[in-house]
């Protein structure tokens, strides 16, 4: 049991006292409900997630507010006895010492101890009388329940068992204020979901003539219960309503098209939703208390259907009028039957067998069914579900069609009042105007024209990009018309980027020199003199590690220097003396970026350095080492602090308490938790995911509100199947900061040599290998289904936060080097990703400002791709060494997702470029923006009109940029080697045509001919 469990002691004793008062009064009654029992046994076995609420767990919730599995309650008029485990017993301890004694008997794994507790309970039952109240219809299972049943059967032969469920039904029937509020809130949630969501979805589907099965529509309604925002917006629900406390009591069930089942056990089938009679019903539970609602909707109804629904409304009103204090339950049913016999006797056989039942913790109280035999009297404060319905009525106007048979139902949840009912579900209209829809006479609505972008994206996504070594077959030989369209589209995108940049940065001045100005951070070594260490009295140099301070004696006084003011310290020897030189930070030193820091007052006088002399060589060497170490530690702490700046503390994960969370077992986590690599399991909770490690109860929580992207990558062509979560803000996993959390399972089993296996003697050839391959394919397909289904469940649970599953398009992927190794990079709908091996790459497409293709020139086998982000302070991302065969595919994809791109023959120094952009972004866009990147590619294509470049580089600057890019860029050494090979070829004097002829000749000699392919691309 969870630690948060707190039992309301006052409520427990109030309800127990009222129960005991009714029990004592019943002993004097001429019509005993309790059957003359001297004791009552309530047995709870193993909890079953699928089981409905019955009298035994209803008793637990009514008295304790919680369900205690594997627990025995024995009630006598003198005391209550509880048999349970020690863990559960500690939650029941506060109940001791009340006005009714509560004795707790603790069981352990020791069978003898459990037997002693059971024997004591049986002795108590015997001493209370020869009749004991039990619940024979409740199905309890589990070892604890079986042990009790076996022991009781052996030791209680002379004790008579009496069904106590009518007495419990009477005790639960009249609700107190808290119970009524919970049922009212559940009812308002039902009404809101029916009228504000289901009706809208149903009418939209019918209006747009979309096909959807009952099961699929039910699943949509089912998922809506997790939408806290939806329920919080419902006007009738109070401000204190907690949307996390609602759950399904039954359903939702949606039926149409001639097949109807009005029982609570009905389920939605796989038939499509059809016009005509549509029935929808469901029940919602709030704080364990239920409410239910059902409505019949008439879509283009026939006259017969309209007439019968109007009559059903009259029946409903007639029953409702008599729902008041003092009415006999069977009179409600008889009134409806009498009205049918008077008005429409042909419908008597089609009328439902009861007009409702008691409702509360149990969805349907079997001891309070409103049929023609129930003689119980209604009392003010009772809650009922009132149901009127007609089943399998033949429509004479639709004879021969599958919709000729129809059913109708109306269900409301009500409270019995002194003078009439209080209808809790009245906000979902049931009059003819509210439930009738007419689409038949309307004109067919025009279908909206889909945007061109969507079609283009899907076309690109479904196309395979062929890779081949033959030049004439490469995608560089592209359709001229397509290239012209792409070039035109790119010009539009470039102009749009410039306009957006001017609008975005209008009135801004940018950062000074392209660097965000750092703020001066104050530091203080000591607040008072008495905080100085005692060793300063010796007037020696002292390094105070605790205060991060170096204390230097100057003119007989200890002077502290905080380590943040010190640049470095060094020791040198000269003759018999050793010299310690301490250099301080001051403005204008021309130090590197790492040491760059702001100063409070640049006009102040600064101390540049101190030199101290001593004959104690070892002492000064130690001091120099201590200062260096202190400085190193200070820088490390500062760096760690800077790294952790964007780590935001997450909210608490809200765990699912009332049912088992959906789990994905046997998955590994990346980045892994510290320690041994073992598989754990992922659980879906109310507001996030939890990865549970089997060791040390470690876990990692990921909240839906922090999920930026959710990816599912199948195991096709891969060794693993995975679900990857890319976060908005980083979290800590162990001691690592990460923005990416991945759950994966290996898709291949360990291979082993079967030599010596007896099966080998009887099977030869490739049969075993073929079977193994078939099994491997089946297993991979099953893995993909399992992980995809789990990813979709994550998306459903997190849909309020906009979580959606994205799957990479492998067919339009390309290889490249984003970090150290060559990997497959794949586009998705919203991102460009590499998820197979760490470090992962996730680039969100809508955050990209522009893409630039580097080293695009004839003779090179690969090129580089640089993404510049809309946040100019973010470093551009490089993907290097992409094969030139992928060039056209990459361009097509960039164009299809509306990313402006340019290309050029060189690697650029992006650090310098971004400093220029950030220093004056408005000026940058006013001077043409990114057009300087396109200048090279435009001239290469032979364009007559050249735009003036906003970022002109001289030859020396280009050379410098090329040199510096070797340090800045992360592509491998092949690129520069290939560039030098090309320049050597150029010097030989062979032109393009000569090179092409030689290449074709070489291809033909290898048995290949490319004469059938299209013309060469003009340069």
From Swiss-Prot:
Asked if the record carries the keyword Transmembrane, the reply is no
Keywords in alphabetical order? Chromosome, Coiled coil, DNA damage, DNA repair, DNA replication, Nucleus, Transcription, Transcription regulation
Q: Which compartment or compartments is the protein found in?
A: Nucleus; Chromosome
- InterPro entries noted in UniProt: Creatin/AminoP/Spt16_N, Creatinase/aminopeptidase-like, FACT-SPT16_Nlobe, Fact-SPT16_PH, FACT_SPT16_C, FACT_SPT16_M, Pept_M24, PH-like_dom_sf
- Name where it mostly resides: nucleus
Using the record for this protein, list the coiled-coil segments as residue ranges, or answer none.
476-500, 614-650, 774-797
The Gene Ontology biological process terms listed for this entry are: constitutive heterochromatin formation; DNA repair; DNA-templated DNA replication; nucleosome assembly; positive regulation of RNA polymerase II transcription preinitiation complex assembly; regulation of sister chromatid cohesion; transcription elongation by RNA polymerase II
Where do the segments described as Disordered lie?
Answer: 754-773, 935-1019
Top-level taxon in the UniProt lineage:
Eukaryota
Q: Where is the composition biased (Low complexity)?
A: 951-962
Taken from the record, one Pfam family name reads Rttp106-like_middle
Q: Give one GO molecular function term.
A: histone binding
What are the annotated GO cellular component locations?
FACT complex
Residue spans with biased composition (Acidic residues)?
Answer: 937-950, 963-976, 983-994
Subunit info here reads: Forms a stable heterodimer with pob3. The spt16-pob3 dimer weakly associates with multiple molecules of nhp6 to form the FACT complex.
Stated role: Component of the FACT complex, a general chromatin factor that acts to reorganize nucleosomes. The FACT complex is involved in multiple processes that require DNA as a template such as mRNA elongation, DNA replication and DNA repair. During transcription elongation the FACT complex acts as a histone chaperone that both destabilizes and restores nucleosomal structure.
Q: Which PANTHER family match?
A: CDC68 RELATED, FACT COMPLEX SUBUNIT SPT16
Q: Which family does it belong to?
A: Belongs to the peptidase M24 family. SPT16 subfamily.
The protein's name in its UniProt record: FACT complex subunit spt16
Lineage start: Eukaryota, Fungi, Dikarya, Ascomycota, Pezizomycotina
